[in-house]
Amino acid sequence: MEEFQGYFELDRSRQHDFLYPLLFREYIYALAHDHGLKKSILFENAGYDNKSSSIIVKRLITRMYQQNPLIFSANDSIQNPFFGQNKNFYSQIISEGFAVIVEIPFSLRLVSSLERKEIAKSHKLRAIHSIFPFLEDKFSHLDYVSDVLIPYHIHLEILVQTLRYWVNDASSLHLLRFFLHEYWNSLITQKNHITIFSKGNPRLFLFLYNSHICEYEYFFLFLRNQSSHLRSTSSGIFFERIYFYVKIEHFVKVFFDNDFQCILWFFKDPFMHYVRYQGKSILASKDTPLLMKKWKYYLVNLWQYHFYVWFQPGRIDINQLCKYSLYFLGYRSSVRLNSSVVRSQMLENSFLINNAMKKFETIVPIIPLIGSLSKANFCDTLGHPISKPTRADSSDSDIIDRFLRISRNLSHYHSGSSKKKSLYRVKYILRLSCVKTLARKHKKTVRTFLKRLGSEFLEEFLTEEEVVLSLIFPRTYSTSRRLYRGRIWYLDITSINDLVNYE
């Protein structure tokens, strides 16, 4: 038992004690401006002097600790138009600066970890598409799968407790706790859940959520490694490379019962596989569903008794892979049985042998994707292309390049689809929407403008991947065409496409 407790011990010597004074350093907000605020009003507002950012932060923190932090005097609004902004903007300023500071302990640990293990940073940053070759290789040999939505109703104190193991600065933690309680309501939607992965979410909350999820995953992987005769190999796939540097290598100290080894014995399963992206995870296993049920209740107990999150066991379904379609990262994946009959002739006797082989299929679901295109005003809810309003000073080449770029990104992201029919329809919607947009700008009919563009315009939308593959295989046109019709995984994609993120 001491062995397990030592495994979870935290290296207190690496705690950082003096992070609070960094809130008033100018370069911190330069970093925050670079990574998060970008072209925000903080650095572009008229009359704002970037040398006085620390003064502004001091005023904001002082007013936060007051009873009514949003009551500003008329003189403040006149002297500094910065205070005329809304409450969400104040929270963004502090959260962006605070996020840079709390990431310092993790970034230093990353550097020391990479130097100790002699691992290149690029090995830690895998592409999103690398998940699918893994699923393609493993899932055809597995039988049961669970699609788990990780609970996100996290109490504020749990998020603060996670940072306490890394930061021993009482002032910083007190400010963080006060800040979370003050601005938490701005992150709650009408459906009463936290939109963790929305674009407008501050970098700080993404960092806190990621660190919380990593703590859960370390408990999970620890139990997985202890319960299996085979050591699992894991590779990190970081969807917020700016926001979070590396998974924590140490665990929170926990206390186990005397029957811990007995509990582990019930979970022995060398064929358990785990994949996660954002708030969704997949558990897959071989043989009977009994072991999957045990892991299911283990996860429920872990969330309820350690993280204090109520999680109903009924939300985790155990399904057979051959009868279930898994929706993950914009693809609908499934394992299908392909039957083939082979006739064997031996002398005067002949035999018919029925071979059933499992095949991993990935299909692009067209209905959700059309809904995403409809929200972006490329088509209506039925998938009929419509013209998109543009600026009057936009040139025709800029409009065409924009549509081509969107089409190219979607084509690359969905290049792993087993069937290309849905992808062709998406290209058709974007192509016709581009033509209608140009016709609307020049006040001409679609037919007239399409004749003006000619057939070359159609080829740019329809045969881009085929041209690229023909350059790779210049002498074997049939090979490139066959590859174009098949699945292609691009290992340079590190973030999910905006039009795909419609879950």
Swiss-Prot record:
Cellular compartment(s): Plastid, Chloroplast
Cellular-component GO terms for this entry: chloroplast
InterPro entries, alphabetized: Domain_X, Maturase_MatK, Maturase_MatK_N
UniProt KW keywords: Chloroplast, mRNA processing, Plastid, RNA-binding, tRNA processing
Residue ranges of the TM segments: none
One MF term in the entry's GO annotations: RNA binding
GO term, biological process aspect, one: RNA splicing
Physiological role: Usually encoded in the trnK tRNA gene intron. Probably assists in splicing its own and other chloroplast group II introns.
Membership in a protein family: Belongs to the intron maturase 2 family. MatK subfamily.
Name of the molecule in the record: Maturase K
Species annotation: Eucalyptus globulus
Phylogenetic lineage: Eukaryota, Viridiplantae, Streptophyta, Embryophyta, Tracheophyta
Name of the gene: matK
